[in-house]
């Protein structure tokens, strides 16, 4: 997860990536190429492509970063012969610079290097490459610097200093928080599986969303052009590009196709109300596919999300309970308990900032919500029920 909330896929480069790396290089600006190679280099030679991709991930390592199956960055290190030091280098696509990709790559490269007995990194950076110098400076390691002929030579120990650990924690907090922000504060919402059939999940969700949210809303139903007086799209690809959040209430058999269509539409979040119990849906594979392409998921089997506060008003939950706005954020994994809790909160006039039903908790977790609510000025108390911890150490650190 990047600092802006986007998700990317990081993997080792292999010789099969030579054509992809060559194409990536060709589409970069002359300035970016010069800052990486210190000379004009419109093309990478076959020898260079093989050198960069044929690595053992011990003395020489190289990582690729992909978004929507496109290579958007790569980084490498090479061990100095006979030493426990390696030189690191990075290149990020012109259109993705400034998103924290180099910082994330640096952390991953350092972890690989340390596991292979490499104790120090070195790097050469052009003196006017302020963005890359800032990446190293903010990583949390004490740097040794030497300036020679317009080039800054950097040298640092790959140690778990307090500054490094704090830097990683701050980056994680920003990334997790912004990923949740994109779901809870959408630009526009689509209810996929919206229905007019009384008593159906699609009907309940659509009615609640239509009567609450202040951002544009859209319905998707393959058999209707109108839902309760609102125009409805037959397919997801007919939705406007502004839609960033999907509330999914379709049969389990249609879930994979629906999520793939949301990915193609480049949505940022999905709340899956659909239950997959007893179905053939491969949830881990679905989530992996979604995350690789920038789509974060709450659910499946979620009761939805809600906020009664005027500035964030949204009622995309199955339980239609009128709650007073306040400072209590509620996270529930159990759907039935969530409904009971909301009704009790209403009865005792408990002011609520957010309600999130995590359901099966396949992607967005309690830890992610904690990171978001930690920086939310409207939240003063967190009430949370969870049946398991995917990362208990991280939960304890955040809480």
Task: Report residues per predicted region.
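Long, contiguous binding/interaction regions
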Residues: 1-182
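Catalytic-core regions of core metabolic enzymes
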Residues: 163-399
């Amino acid at each position: 997860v990047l600092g802006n909330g986007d998700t990317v896929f990081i993997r080792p480069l292999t010789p099969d990536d030579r054509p992809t790396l060559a194409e990536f290089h060709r589409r970069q600006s002359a300035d970016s190429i010069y800052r990486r190679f210190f000379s004009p280099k419109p093309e990478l030679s076959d020898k260079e492509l093989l050198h960069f991709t044929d690595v053992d991930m011990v003395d020489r390592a190289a990582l690729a970063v992909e978004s929507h199956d496109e290579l958007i960055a790569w980084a490498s290190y090479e061990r100095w012969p006979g030493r426990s030091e390696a030189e690191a280098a990075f290149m990020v696509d012109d259109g993705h610079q400034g998103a924290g990709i180099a910082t994330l790559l640096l952390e991953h490269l350092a972890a690989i290097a340390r596991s292979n007995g490499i104790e120090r990194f070195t790097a050469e950076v052009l003196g006017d490459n302020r963005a890359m110098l800032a990446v190293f400076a903010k990583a949390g390691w004490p740097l040794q610097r030497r300036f020679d002929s317009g080039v800054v030579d950097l040298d640092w120990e790959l140690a778990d200093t307090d500054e490094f650990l704090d830097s990683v924690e701050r980056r994680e907090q920003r990334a997790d928080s912004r990923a949740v922000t994109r779901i809870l504060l959408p630009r526009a919402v689509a209810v996929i599986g919206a229905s007019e059939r009384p008593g159906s999940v699609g009907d309940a969700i659509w009615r609640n969303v239509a009567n609450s949210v202040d951002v544009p809303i859209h319905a998707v139903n393959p058999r209707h052009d109108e839902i309760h007086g609102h125009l409805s799209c037959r397919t997801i690809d007919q939705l406007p590009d502004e839609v960033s959040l999907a509330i999914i209430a379709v049969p389990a058999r249609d879930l994979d196709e629906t999520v793939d269509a949301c990915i193609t539409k480049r949505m940022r979040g999905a709340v899956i109300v659909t239950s997959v119990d007893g179905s053939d849906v491969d949830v881990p594979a679905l989530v992996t596919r979604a995350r690789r392409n920038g789509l974060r998921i709450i659910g499946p089997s979620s009761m939805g999300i809600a906020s009664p506060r005027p500035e964030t008003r949204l009622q995309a939950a199955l339980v239609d309970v009128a709650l007073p706005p306040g400072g209590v954020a509620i996270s529930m994994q159990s759907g039935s308990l969530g409904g009971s809790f909301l009704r009790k909160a209403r009865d005792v006039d408990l002011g609520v900032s957010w309600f999130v039903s995590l359901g099966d908790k396949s992607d967005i977790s309690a830890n992610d919500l904690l990171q978001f609510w930690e920086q939310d000025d409207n939240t003063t108390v967190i009430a949370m029920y969870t049946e398991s911890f995917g990362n208990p150490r991280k939960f304890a650190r955040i809480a």
